[in-house]
């Protein structure tokens, strides 16, 4: 799993952790439903999770569009509810699941 956090939003560490967790849970649910064999492989491989910082909302949207070109890559777009630090509807995190080759 790869998570791209929107660096332009200046979220606290706790907020970033929560947004990444939302994306991870969403991807996990998608894997259970759509790609159970890939989920099993990922679990047997150590459940690798990588978090990187994106520069902007535009960058996350571009990455999402590129990922959706490959039907084997799962995506999770997290938009904030606006209850704490960030304006409602802000794209906070993009979660991606695929093989290393697919995500590079």
Each model region followed by its residue ranges:
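Compact, glycine-rich, soluble single-domain proteins
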Residues: 29-47, 53-57
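Alpha-helix N-cap/helix-start motif
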Residues: 13-14, 60, 87
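Short, solvent-exposed amphipathic alpha-helical segments in soluble enzyme
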Residues: 18-21, 65-69
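Short basic, glycine-rich beta-strand/loop surfaces that mediate nucleic-acid
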Residues: 2-4, 45-55, 68-104
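Surface-exposed loop/turn and secondary-structure junction residues enriched for glycine/proline
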Residues: 12, 19, 34, 42-45, ...
